[in-house]
Each structure stands twice: as C-alpha cells, then as structure tokens.
Amino acid sequence: MSKPVSERSVRLLDSMSPILHFLNDSIWSSRRHETGICDFTIGNPHEMPPRELVEAYSRWIEPRNEHWFAYKMNETGPRDVLEGSLRQWRNIPFEAEDIFLTNGAIAALAVVLGTIVDPGDEVIFISPPWFQYEGMILNAGGIPVRIRLLPETFDLDLGAIDEAIGPKTRAVIINSPQNPTGRIFPSEVLKDLAGMLESKSRESGRTVYLISDEAYSRIVFEGKTFPSPVAFYHESFLVYTYGKVLLAPGERIGFIALPPTMSERVQIRKALVGVQMMNGWSFPNALLQYALGDIDKIGIDIAHLQRKRDRLYTALTAAGYEALLPEGTFYMLVRSPWRDDEAFIELLARHDIFCIPGSTMDIPGYFRICFTPGDDTVERSLAGFELALRQAAEMGEARS
C-alpha cells in the first residue's frame, strides 16, 4: 500500500517534532487561552498594537483606483522605500532592484534557500537555533549541518564552522541578534567569518553564501550598535521581517536584499523572482506594500521592552536563577535548576507561568522567556518564579 505522504514531509515533521509537541500537546497548549496566566512562550503581542500601525492600515485600505488590489510582486514604490531605509540602517548602498519583497522572513528564507540550494548541498546553521531552520533546509533539498555556539559565551564557534565547511557546503545561516540567546555577534567575529568564507570559496571554486537573518536587528538594547554580517561579506543575502519590531507577526511583510558587492547579481535576481512565484506566491499583500512607507517608521517601545528585560533579569538572578542578559531580541535564556527542563517547565505551569523549554531549541537544561507580555504580567510572575526555584531545590537532585 502506498504511503499517503512524501518522505520529505516525514523528515520535515521529525525536525519540527519538539516544538510541534509543545505547541499542540503540552500543558501550555491546553491552558494558553486561560485568563490570568503568565504566558512568556512566543513573541506574540499582549497589548494593543501601536496606534500608528492601525492608522497606516486605515490610510491605505481605501482604493485609489480600480487596480488597487491587483496582483502585487516586487513593486517599485516599496522597493524605493527600502533602498533608503537600508542605506540609513545598514550604511550599505543597496539598490532598489536588489530588494525583493516577501510575506515575512520565513518566506524570504525559503526563497533564498530555493534559489541557491541543489539536492545534496549542505547548509550550516547555528544552534541553539530558531525552530524552523533545519526543516527549511530539508524542504529545499539540502542537508542541514548543525554547529553549536561556544558554551557559556554563546559566541560563534569559528573553528567548528571552518571544520564543517566542505565541497558540498552551499551556505551558512547566521541569526543576529540571535534567538534564543539574545547575542549580537561582534564585528571582529563577523570579519573573521567573512575571511573564512572567502577563503573556503576560493579553495573549492564554488561560492559559499552567507544568509543573514536579521529579524531582530531593530530590537537592540542600551544603545548598542548592530553590525550586519552583510557589511563584511560580499556574497550575502540579508533577510528581514517587520513582524518583530512591530510585534505584529500576523501581518506578514519582509524582504530579501542583495548587497551591491554580490557577484552574479543579475542571474540571482531573476532566479529569486521565479522562486517567489513558485514558492506559494511569496509576495506581501497589496495593502502592506502600499503602507510600507509608514510601517518602516513605526516600532514598539524599545526602552519599555528593555525595562521589562531588566526587571525580569534582576529579579530572577536575585532569586538564584542563572540568566543570560540579552543584547537584543525579546527573549531571555535562563538555566533550569533541573537538567530536565521540560519537568521544570511543568513545575512553573503549576504557578501559572509558561515558558519554552530549551529542549525544543536543542539546548536542554535551559528555558526561554519571551518578555513581550505587559508589566502587570511580569510583576505577577516574579513570586511564582521564586517559589518554583525553591520547590525545585526542596525536591532534591532527582531531576538535576
């Protein structure tokens, strides 16, 4: 009897099984809609969206002509907006024709991988990773190669990356600021990475591309400068989404940008558009393209987000937790008092506190806090966090 689904879909499901189990079969999944819980799991909004965002949508929803809601691809107006924005934010002279509008960063990553990866090509990604990198590489026909961040510092392990690059390597995916650690990789490390990729490309006679996932690049704290990996390596793809800085992940708009230094840009441009069309029509809806000039100027209150970060970090470390202070993103990585992080997540749930277990992100023994909830939720959670830690100590080392 024939199988109802493809082998590829089976592999994809297997790569996603830890997070799918959490989303569909955990205590959180059964209680997520309860009022009064402290939900620190996913980067969803917990307060009303920025008024400016609602006004932008209202301003552009009214049709100006009969073609207002016609098919949209990489339209000239929003591309021009992004050319100016990228020159401001990245200080790189991107050109409008090298910018490709997508319905979010997930679509952008899928389009880039579909453009450059052939079956059997290897794609390196960094662990602990965002949940979907491995599955997206598999979906493109590639072979995922996992490289862990250096322990304790959570910096890029350039030695391990160097050793992993071989004749089949097609790309390296870097996410900075990094989910889930909040780490911003420093310029010196990115320069060394660029030099390595240039050397490896020369040796093999085949370009090793850098895919720079910069979804959180506008969410940085304490006035830090975000160094874009694209600034250091010619053969790079910049991937971005507005869903994070707007805290509106249900409104899907993002882009791919090619730096002017990239070789073979003309051929890559054509291929990207073709893959966009075949990859489920990976272009943003008309309304979002019209509104992009307004959307690009809007963002959540980063200072407020930093205050919530600081409140959680100070309270948790004072209670006895070990936590990594994030330099960017809206996530904080905290060490579980038990090696079995899923068991500790269940203990937190008894106090109506919900976080993501590190085992879903290939970092067992930790858990991730998303600090997008409001101040009242943060304050209500602190006593429960402290009590759960005391209970874990009282229950002994059975789970540690």
Which residues make up each language-model segment?
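N-terminal small-domain helix-loop-helix segment of the aminotransferase-like
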Residues: 5-104, 111, 295-299, 391-400
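Conserved core of the PLP fold type I
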Residues: 62, 66-205, 217-233, 237, ...
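Short amphipathic alpha-helical/adjacent loop interface patches that line ligand
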Residues: 79, 212, 309-310, 382
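PLP-dependent enzyme catalytic core of the Aspartate aminotransferase-like
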Residues: 162, 346-356, 360-400
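Conserved core segment of the aminotransferase class I/II
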Residues: 234-306, 389, 396
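Accessory recognition modules or surfaces
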Residues: 279-280, 284, 306, 332-351, ...
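Conserved glycine-rich beta-strand-loop-beta hairpin in the small C-terminal domain of fold type I
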Residues: 286-293, 305-316, 323-335, 361, ...
